[in-house]
Amino acid sequence: MKVNKLKGKIVENGMSNPQFAEAIGMNYSTLLRKFKAPEKITCVEAEKMRIALNLKADEATEIFLA
C-alpha cells in the first residue's frame, strides 16, 4: 500500500486522519498502526477506504496493490 498517496487522498477529501478512521469504522490508533505496517491491511479494510474516499478502480489499484 502506498501510504503517502492514501494520506493525500484523505486530505483531498477534506478529512483528518481521525475523521477518516471513524468513516471506515476503525479506531484511530489502529489506523496509525496500519499506516506503519501497510502490508497488514485486509481486503475488507481496503474496500472500506476506497468507498470512504470515493476512489476510482484505477486509483484504488495504484494505492492498495502497488
Model-found features: residue ranges?
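Residues in the recognition helix of alpha-helical DNA-binding motifs
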Residues: 9, 23, 34-35, 63
